[in-house]
Design a protein with these regions (language model features):
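Glycine-centered loop/turn positions within well-structured domains
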Residues: 63, 82, 98
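Glycine- and acidic-residue-biased ligand/ion/polar-headgroup-sensing regions
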Residues: 63-64, 68-73
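A short, N-terminal "cap"/entry segment at the start of jelly-roll beta-barrel domains
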Residues: 1-41, 127-141
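A short hydrophobic beta-strand segment most commonly corresponding to one strand
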Residues: 91, 106-124
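Short acidic-glycine-tyrosine-enriched beta hairpin
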Residues: 79-95
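Conserved short histidine dyad/triad with adjacent acidic residue
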Residues: 28-33, 44-60
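Short beta-strand His + acidic residue motifs that chelate non-heme Fe in jelly-roll/DSBH
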Residues: 56-57, 75-76, 92, 98-105
Length: 141
């Protein structure tokens, strides 16, 4: 079966409305099946863990990749805790519990998260519930 041909797409992250989870985390969906119009596209989220906060963590049914854009923090991977910093890529296999901790820093920890299936992302579901779609610009209500 031939894949649906898509036009090139550019997304300005600064113009994507964040979904805010309390004071600790902001999530911006910057690429997904709804934006591109094709179900098999890689999902990309821009996340910011605010300085002084930690996230609860989860284990997913799909592999996930973190690319640390900036900042420093800790990442729990099952029973191991590693230091994370800008420029680092972390592969998180399916079933691995992972949690980001930015409590020891005075700067935000910014990451890109990549995964295959949009159905395995809690923030995606929260966006649909709140906005009726996965992506909003800052110019929308």
């Amino acid at each position: 079966m031939e894949k649906k041909k898509l036009p090139p797409l550019s997304v300005d992250v600064a113009k994507v409305k964040p979904l805010v989870f309390g004071e600790e985390y902001e999530s911006r969906m910057i690429l997904d099946h709804a934006i591109t119009g094709r179900d098999d596209v890689i999902q990309i989220n821009h996340g910011t863990v605010k300085a002084g906060y930690a996230l609860g963590g989860a284990a997913h049914e799909e592999d996930e990749i973190y690319y640390i854009l900036s900042g420093k923090g800790k990442l729990q991977l099952d029973d191991e805790i590693i230091d994370v910093y800008g420029g680092q890529v972390i592969f998180i296999p399916a079933g691995c519990f992972h949690a980001l901790d930015n409590r020891g820093s005075d700067e935000d920890l910014c990451i890109l998260t990549f995964w295959r299936d949009w159905r395995f992302n809690d923030a995606y579901e929260a966006r649909l519930k709140l906005w009726g779609k996965s992506f909003k610009t800052i110019d929308e209500d």
